[in-house]
Amino acid sequence: SAEVKLYELKHGTQMSLKAASTLMANIMNGRRYMPFWVQLLLGGTDSEGSHIYSLDAAGGSIPDQFQTTGSGSPFVYGVLEDRFRENLSLTEGKKLGVRALTAAMKRDSASGDGISMCVIDSKGFQKVSPEEIEKIETTLAA
């Protein structure tokens, strides 16, 4: 956003994820009487590490180790709360994500029928290929 760019120009450094989350929460809160009916997930890495925030329509900002949103989120949370642990490898994290989303798709018709996945780390944003997701699904089904 323009506010983030302005911050970077003024301070000569990138805005932290916590500050970006607060900025977005303030924008959402400013529209509280005519809100954007969305729930946003804001995640990434900064000088303090990796972070993910859930932002609601009223401007609430909640940090956690993992976040989910949408109609299938209760099913996704069930899997994540059972299987998530600190310092998962990238491969383990992808498998856990596919397992959690597969559970939601099986139990919630509004969750759709397909998985899109990305990895956000210190190297940037990378989309996980459909072939890799299919390969993970196959190993989980076995």
Model-derived regions: residue spans:
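Long, low-complexity N-terminal extensions
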Residues: 1-142
